[in-house]
């Protein structure tokens, strides 16, 4: 991007994708996602009211970039609404949810799959990026979302959080 970078806030490499977040001299945030083949950027104004990206959807790989960029913006935009996107696999049973937390590869999805296999009525609510929300009455609920993990699961549903298991 042509925007001057003022300060690097975060730089992570995961699954061959580098994500770098910078402050710009115009007090905006610049998010840069890079693979070996391509780099795309997104610029967010200081109030999170306007987001611009250079993704043109003119290459098959652009879906990956736009999906990641939207996921990141969504995760920040929901915070003022008492919501948090987390990394977990969620098993639902009779309206109650168990959230299995941990880093990638620790068995969250496997644990959820075993619940579905051995506990009658257990279902998968989300397998990677569920949304936690503190409701006005103080109840904590978990919601499915458009992002899932190793098991495709895109449910527009929610359940009462009974336990967080790490």
Identify the residue ranges that each predicted region occupies.
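Conserved lysine of the Walker
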Residues: 108
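Hydrophobic positions on the alpha1 helix immediately C-terminal to the Walker A/P-loop
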Residues: 111
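A noncatalytic interaction/capping subdomain that flanks phosphate/NTP-handling catalytic cores
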Residues: 1-104, 114-123, 131-166
């Amino acid at each position: 991007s042509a925007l001057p970078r003022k300060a690097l806030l975060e730089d992570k490499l995961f699954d061959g994708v580098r994500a770098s977040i910078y402050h710009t001299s115009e007090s905006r945030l610049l998010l840069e996602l890079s693979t070996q083949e391509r780099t795309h950027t997104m610029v967010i104004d200081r109030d999170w009211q306007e987001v611009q990206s250079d993704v043109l959807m003119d290459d098959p790989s652009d879906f990956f970039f736009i999906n990641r960029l939207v996921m990141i913006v969504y995760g920040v935009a929901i915070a003022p609404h008492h919501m948090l996107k987390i990394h977990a696999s969620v098993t639902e049973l009779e309206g109650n949810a168990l959230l299995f937390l941990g880093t990638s590869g620790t068995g969250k999805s496997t644990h959820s799959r075993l619940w579905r296999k051995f506990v009658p009525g257990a279902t998968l609510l989300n397998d990677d990026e569920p949304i936690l929300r503190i409701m006005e009455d103080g109840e904590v609920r978990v919601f499915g979302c458009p992002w899932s993990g190793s098991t495709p699961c895109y449910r527009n549903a929610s359940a009462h959080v009974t336990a967080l298991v790490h």
